[in-house]
């Protein structure tokens, strides 16, 4: 017994060392990649008013263009991640970053509503698969116990993108007139090229798997592979079998729909917050960016606090439920408020909840999938959420184009209520999934196998 305990302690120490190496080597570049994704998403919100003035894009057309990014992203999400599974995360994340960076720079050539739609659609197609590819990379390198923390760190990059992207975009827009370009053209050009630079570092620094990492010993790579394994499912040896199972498992569908409701609200806020701030008589692109960045700071706090609460409660589904319910009174309060400061604070509170909860969605999913099925399942969840990213800005822009603020508020309140109504379904399907996994574990154990005989 003592020898077994000593061996286990040695394995735990080896895993801790290998995990620290992986975190130190991989998380900075993965976070930087995700940071740039949200800087590039924030910039179109910063450019909204300028695009309307300089190019003649209407509020309704802006809503369509902002959302159409998510439509093409959603259409290509699953194919993108199945390719990623074949070629490896390193090659595919690099490809994604290069193409989305170049197309982000191409936003500077937008001349009318049609070209706005086309570039936004292509931009979504280029970026399709980024987030599930990052999540899949996490499942390869980190154990289930570590993943909620690692995903939380990635979401800190999202918050940093929100918090710093708007002021950065505002600062670049102050270059208005330099070289004969509008300020928004400078913003898209510079931020797109920065993304291409980040892609180079992904190619150089991110191995596909632990055994490919020159900075790990063979024993360290082996222990990372061993601890990263989570329970699988029947049919994981075939592509068709995994896709069918991932799409048919009820807990995946329930989680996907709640994530959809979350994204309707959060993306509508993300793409319209700078113009909301401007409508509250805040002047100057940089100052508008600074005030808009408050939503990123609130999101940062949420990503720190909500996973911390989950670690204390040790029940991610329960915490997910509480936070989802809390979004309803915040959305209602925003819809009836009229003070500028209060409205900004309520938007910040909404983003704290909506973004802070995101690591829990992925923790619930990753605990119950592995291998190719994880690649397909995570992509499916993200795809459904991306459809929410299309619906939210589209409905909000449609309401704004008709001069109806109350209809825009109804989008946020309705999405919050939808998430709450779906919670009982999630609870039921997760319990069913866990019972199924427990039964499979019993059958796979020596005692279970003996009983089966």
Predicted segments with their positions:
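A late C-terminal transmembrane helix in Major Facilitator Superfamily
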Residues: 162, 368-404
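Glycine-rich segments within core transmembrane alpha-helices of 12-TM secondary carriers
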Residues: 149-173, 194-195, 382-392
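Cytoplasmic helix-loop-helix junction between adjacent transmembrane helices
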Residues: 119-156
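Helix-to-loop junctions at the C-terminal end of transmembrane segments
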Residues: 76-89, 302-315, 400
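Helix-breaking motifs and short loop linkers at transmembrane-helix boundaries and internal kinks
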Residues: 56, 88, 109-115, 126, ...
């Amino acid at each position: 017994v003592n020898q077994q305990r000593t061996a286990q302690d040695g394995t735990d120490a080896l895993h801790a060392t290998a995990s620290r190496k992986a975190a130190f080597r991989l998380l900075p570049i993965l976070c930087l990649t995700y940071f740039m994704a949200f800087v590039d998403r924030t910039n179109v919100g910063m450019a909204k008013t300028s695009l309307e003035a300089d190019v003649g894009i209407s509020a309704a057309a802006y809503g369509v263009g902002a959302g159409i990014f998510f439509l093409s992203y959603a259409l290509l999400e699953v194919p993108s991640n199945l390719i990623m599974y074949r070629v490896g995360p390193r090659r595919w994340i690099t490809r994604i970053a290069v193409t989305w960076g170049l197309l982000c720079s191409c936003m500077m050539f937008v001349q009318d509503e049609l070209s706005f739609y086309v570039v936004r659609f292509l931009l979504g197609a280029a970026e399709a698969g980024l987030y599930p590819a990052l999540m899949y990379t996490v499942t390869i390198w980190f154990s289930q116990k570590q993943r909620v923390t690692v995903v939380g760190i990635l979401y800190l990059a999202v918050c940093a993108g929100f918090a710093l992207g708007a002021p950065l975009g505002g600062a670049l827009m102050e270059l208005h007139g330099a070289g004969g370009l509008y300020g928004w053209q400078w913003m898209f050009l510079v931020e797109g090229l920065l993304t291409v630079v980040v892609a180079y570092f992904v190619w150089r620094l991110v191995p596909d798997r632990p055994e490919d990492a020159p900075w790990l010993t063979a024993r360290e790579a082996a222990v990372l592979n061993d601890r990263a394994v989570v329970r699988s499912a029947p049919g994981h040896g075939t592509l068709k079998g995994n896709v069918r199972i991932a799409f048919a498992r009820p807990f995946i569908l329930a989680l996907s729909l709640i994530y959809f409701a979350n994204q309707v609200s959060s993306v509508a806020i993300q793409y319209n917050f700078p113009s909301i701030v401007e409508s509250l008589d805040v002047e100057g692109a940089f100052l508008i960016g600074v005030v808009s960045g408050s939503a990123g700071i609130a999101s940062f706090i949420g990503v720190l606090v909500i996973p911390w609460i989950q670690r204390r409660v040790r029940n991610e589904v329960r915490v997910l439920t509480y936070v989802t319910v809390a979004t309803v009174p915040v959305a209602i309060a925003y819809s009836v408020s009229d003070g500028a400061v209060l409205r900004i604070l309520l938007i910040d509170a909404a983003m704290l909840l909506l973004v802070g909860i995101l690591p829990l969605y992925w923790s619930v999913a990753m605990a119950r999938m592995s291998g190719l099925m994880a690649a397909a399942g995570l992509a499916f969840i993200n795809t459904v959420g991306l459809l929410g990213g299309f619906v939210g800005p589209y409905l909000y822009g449609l309401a704004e184009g008709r001069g109806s603020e109350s209809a825009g508020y109804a989008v946020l309140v309705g999405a919050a209520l939808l998430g709450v109504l779906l919670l009982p379904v999630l609870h039921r399907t997760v319990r069913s999934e866990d019972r199924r996994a427990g039964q499979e574990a019993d059958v796979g154990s020596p005692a279970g196998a003996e009983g089966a005989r």
